[in-house]
Amino acid sequence: MAKLGYKVEADPSKTAKAMGRTLRISKKHALEICREINGMKLETAVSFLNRVLALETPVPFKVHNKDVPHRKGKIGTHAGRFPQKATEEILKVLDNAKKNAEYKGLNTEKLRIKHISSNKGFIIKRFMPRAFGRASPKYQETIHIQVILEEFY
């Protein structure tokens, strides 16, 4: 497996990093969630994602919004969804980054998301048996998520 580095260079004394690899979530959902929470304070982002899990606040879909229904409320755009599986996985990666910050001695109340991105992972190839001895391919795409938290003053 190839070594996967971070896209952004950061000062190690003020930042904490975490990465989630080969997550079985939708790449479109991961892109929209990462775009929405990038630059937020960590506590604000976690509370936003918890509201998404509770089906209270939708994630605005600005890029992949074809056939996405409108949602009421002020979300910045009309189209939005509640991506449950991707939200849970991104919350786990954010929790790991917060624990890394605690280990490094950073103030966890003053952390903001400096960088978060989703990258395409490898494809898990499987086959579904069909009639008359044939088989159809069944592909499962995976996603890598990388997070850099920065302490602000």
From Swiss-Prot:
Keywords: Ribonucleoprotein, Ribosomal protein, RNA-binding, rRNA-binding. One of its GO terms (biological process) is cytoplasmic translation. One of its GO terms (molecular function) is structural constituent of ribosome. Pfam families: Ribosomal_L22 (PF00237). It comes from the Archaea. Disulfide bonds: none annotated. The keyword Ribosomal protein applies. The keyword Cell membrane does not apply. SUPFAM superfamilies: Ribosomal protein L22 (SSF54843). GO terms for cellular component: cytosolic large ribosomal subunit. Belongs to the universal ribosomal protein uL22 family. Part of the 50S ribosomal subunit. This protein binds specifically to 23S rRNA. It makes multiple contacts with different domains of the 23S rRNA in the assembled 50S subunit and ribosome. The globular domain of the protein is located near the polypeptide exit tunnel on the outside of the subunit, while an extended beta-hairpin is found that lines the wall of the exit tunnel in the center of the 70S ribosome. NCBIfam families: PRK04223.1, uL22_arch_euk. This is Large ribosomal subunit protein uL22. It comes from Methanococcus vannielii (strain ATCC 35089 / DSM 1224 / JCM 13029 / OCM 148 / SB). The lineage of its organism: Archaea, Methanobacteriati, Methanobacteriota, Methanomada group, Methanococci. The gene is rpl22.
